[in-house]
From Swiss-Prot:
GO terms for cellular component: extracellular region. Inhibited by carbon monoxide (CO). This inhibition is explained by the presence of heme attached to the enzyme and modulated by CO. The state change of heme induced by CO (carboxyheme or metheme) may inhibit the enzyme. This is Snake venom metalloproteinase CatroxMP-II. Its cofactor is Zn(2+). Its EC number is 3.4.24.-. The lineage of its organism: Eukaryota, Metazoa, Chordata, Craniata, Vertebrata. It is an enzyme of class 3 (hydrolase).
């Protein structure tokens, strides 16, 4: 889901 993707981008 897009919401999870946002957290992935913040993690990297």
């Amino acid at each position: 889901n897009p919401e999870h993707q946002r957290y992935v981008e913040l993690f990297i």
